[in-house]
Amino acid sequence: MFVGETQGAKQKVSGLRHNYNLKILYTIFLTRCTCYDKLNYGDIMVKIMFVCHGNICRSTMAEFVMKDIVKKNGMENDFIICSSATSTEEIGSDTHWGTKKILDEMGISYTKRQAVQLKKSDYEYYDFIIGMDSANMRNINRIIGYDKDNKIHKLLNFANMDRDVADPWYTRDFKTTYDDVLLGCTRLFDYINSYI
């Protein structure tokens, strides 16, 4: 399990020192997010929110890739994994067909969903809020405000890289985006798992 709230877990990631308050949080309510697979009342869970611009390409890809990773490790009951947008442009839209196609090719399951926007109150609920690029990070901080608990990070920082996960909405290269998402999610899982 994670260390208690009063015990900070410190780790150096991509040259930056992060002091995580890895809190023991209990699942006592549902939020408006539509991507929960299951919630077990009273169970201790790690809560991750992936964020991109529209919540139809990269963040939803990361959501399903991370769910696949934790499931393959027999830990699906230890995580709540969701995704959201910084913008309102695609609210209510399902996952982009290009993301579905690459997930199909990689044998990763996904469910029908609706894009939602990140909100300020998500900060108190989630342990990690993970952006895909520098623009996402600016917009996340604009929505959330002060990151007092060091919860907000860029995905590839966990792979000791400072670069962005490219938006396939523009590049149309969903395979390269998938490779970056898989790398980032794998390293994020390894990081979290080292404290469980």
What is each of the regions a protein language model found here?
Residues 1-2, 10-17, 22, 28:
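Composition-driven detection of intrinsically disordered, low-complexity segments
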Residues 3-5, 9, 13, 37, ...:
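Acidic, Ala/Val/Gly-enriched low-complexity intrinsically disordered segments
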Residues 20-44:
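Short, Lys/Arg-enriched N-terminal segments with co-localized hydrophobic residues
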Residues 36, 41-125, 190-196:
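Conserved active-site segments centered on acidic
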Residues 52, 103, 130-131, 181:
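Hydrophobic structural packing positions in well-ordered secondary structure
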Residues 122, 128, 134-196:
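Phosphate-binding/catalytic loops
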